[in-house]
UniProtKB/Swiss-Prot annotation:
Residues 1-11 have a biased composition (Polar residues). Residues 1-24, 273-337 are annotated as: Disordered. It comes from Olive latent virus 2 (isolate Italy). One of its GO terms (biological process) is transport of virus in host, cell to cell. This is Movement protein. The lineage of its organism: Viruses, Riboviria, Orthornavirae, Kitrinoviricota, Alsuviricetes.
Amino acid sequence: MAGLWRSNSTLDVERGRNRTQTETVQTVPRQAQGILELLSSPAAREALQGSDFARWRGVPVSPAGGYFELAPLRSVNTFARGLRSVFGGSTSRREAYIPQHGFYRLNYVLVAVVPHVEHSDPGEVTVQLVENTNPTRAVDGQELTARLADGSFVFAAAPTYDIVLEQAPILVEGESAGVVQRMFGIRTSVSGSLTTGSVVSVYPIWSAEFPIQGATFNHVAPSIVHIDRFNRSVAFEIDVLRRRFSLMRPLHLARSRESFQVGRMSLDVARPSVVRPPPVDPQAEGGIHVNSPTSEQSQGEDRVPRAGLASGTSVGEGANHEFLSGAVKSTAPVRQT
């Protein structure tokens, strides 16, 4: 969890690193450069301010791989005192953003992966949804591998269970190696690449909450949407992917007035408790489509995250996907490990 709380000296180091990254971007292929600028643009950050997503920040990944926990970073500070009053705990910084009782629910995670390699690079990148107590094992088979030469893509995954907020031992090669707070995370590894240094950057966004009642969920296979050039079609496809995970997973869900949703509080009684997106017409856009749930599948759904990929409404509508303007998806093969 290092880096969640940063001192002034740490910020100075990050500013220097950001300048180095800016210089490095100039050497990457034009496609990756454009995508990086798009994902890091002020418009993207501003559009996500009101959403349920906890993070929209590039994380460089070296050939040795990388791991980060899907813990709330930004907006949870707004209601940290509310979390403590509901769930108890001290006023330490750790307990200010993770309650000590109840459950951690990861609704879904989307990870934009941007390679920084030549078009002929033979390497592959594997993205896994893992639990930090066993960071080398994918949760529920939520793992996919793609060729670096195929370009940028978005990886979507979701677990089938809630995590109990408790301390648990870390397993490294089957042996205990300390104790941590249980959390979900994303592990990225690179193999076979001829590039040294940072091979890819990952941009994780996710929706999570801390309910006081646990639930189990339908299994939804992990998915990848390849991106060649940004246009409205791919923005539409990514949002369909998000809807698929948010609508098809729940088996049983007990909505609680004491449930806090990352990005905003879920106690707004002025809004309806059920917000379903309009049905998706698979023929409306070109490219590869992700099946949306039927009305029978979505019946009984108590909670749907209110935010779209860009802001409070779908990125497939109106001006909310301006920062995702562009894309023709490729039909590059994806190998599931």
